Every structure is written in C-alpha cells, then in structure tokens.
C-alpha cells in the first residue's frame, strides 16, 4: 500500500488540521468505535519476543477477530457485543499496534500470522473461525494458505493478495485520511512507546511496498471455507481485485456490503455482524 505513502502523508497533513466534514452518505463517514464490553479474560501473551495484548469474551465455538493496519482491537467492539452472545470471541492488538509491544524484526504477513497462531496456542485454542479486516484479512489468508488445520472458516474483508490490488485513489480520500489521523492519536494514547509512531508507520509501510504477493495458483490451494467481503464503496481495494480473489479461491463466497466502505465494521456494525455470523455459522 505504501508505494503511495509519501503522497498520502502529504495529503493527511493538509486535511488533519481541518474538521472532518459531515458526509452525505454512510460510506463516507468514520464513526467512533462503540465501547468495548467487559472481557472475561484479558492480558498480555508472551509471543515471538513481544507482549501481545488480547481479550476474550463469551463462550462457545471460538472466533478470532483481527484488525487492520495501524489500528487496534477496539474497532471490533460492536462485533464483540453481538458475536460473544453465541461464541467465544478473541481479539488482540497485532505486534506494534495498540497496546502490544514490538521487536525490531521486519514486519511481514507470515510473521504476523505466526504471532496469532502463537496466541491461539497460548489460549489453548486448536481451531477457530477468523474474521479479518484489511491487514487482518490478509493475515487470515496467510493462515489459510500455510496452516489450514487451525481454521474452520475465514471471513476476509477489505483484503488484498497483491500490492496492485490497492486503489491509487486512496491517497486523496478524506475518509482514509481521517483514519490515519485517528490511528496516530490512538497510538499515542495506547502504545507503550507513544513517541515512536513515525518509526512504527515506516516499518509497516516497508511491508506494504512488497506484500502480499500471492499467485492465483497459491490461492487455488486454499481449502478453508472462505468469504471474500467488501463494502460497495471501498476506498482502498479495487472492486475487480476483490472479485478476482473470490474467483481464485475455490468455493469462496463473495459478499458485498451495501452503503459501506473499507470501514464497514464501524459504518454498518449490525449488518457486518450478521453477515459474519451467517457465514461462520453456516453448515
């Protein structure tokens, strides 16, 4: 994604100091996350050399929710409230994100997938459904490719499988600029290294320049039941790329969420939760 990063950073500087205009359409908004329910269990798991923040809610068949790049687990608050009524819901902050610490090891999706697998081991969860947004969906695809025995179903929203799946128009999109600005503020509030946001972004950006890079042949080997999901106004991922992913993964279901964008879980929380539940609970 960050072959556009320098230009996008300049755009953010021009827009962050102005109030985010009231949007005419839901898909142009960036709602604040709801309040996260009280966790049944939370803490820090020693994972791959860093401390990974996690929280667990409810009981039942497990569901792992993985957030997107530069974000944190609290974006899932609405989904946690709904899914935890019938499932054991696990959320976490990816390495370097939110409350989790990070190492100097270069970021990569294989590495981040291994972090989540280690967290599942720590929580003694052998197999889980996975709901992933953006980078979280990419991590889910990585696990489906390399460790399908750990997944029951995969709901991957706003993910890409090659770098050219990113829409270059994202660099001038106000909603996405507002997200980057909010992410910086959240990082300073939540991180154990609040003064290192620029270094963190640089590390993530380096990964985005070259990853992911999966071929159609690789995607064709995925056996996990998969839903490829997108808002009908996604700012960051090209629609044709989303459709390509759904056609390349055997048996994948394509789900398009109406009047929603890259941030569908915030814009349409109820519809998002019901779409996810309908897929992960399907027999």
Where do the language-model regions lie?
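Active-site loop/oxyanion-hole signature of alpha/beta-hydrolase fold enzymes
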Residues: 57, 91-131
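Flexible "cap/lid" loop of the alpha/beta hydrolase fold
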Residues: 138-146, 152-185
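Active-site nucleophile elbow and catalytic-triad environment of alpha/beta-hydrolase enzymes
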Residues: 202-218
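Short beta-strand/loop motif that positions the catalytic acidic residue
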Residues: 222, 228-230
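Alpha/beta-hydrolase fold catalytic core
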Residues: 2-6, 11-14, 21-61, 86, ...
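Conserved HGGG/HGGXW glycine-rich cap/lid loop of the alpha/beta-hydrolase fold
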Residues: 50-99
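Acidic catalytic loop of the alpha/beta-hydrolase fold
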Residues: 233-237
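Catalytic active-site module of serine/aspartate enzymes centered on a nucleophile-bearing elbow/loop
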Residues: 258-283
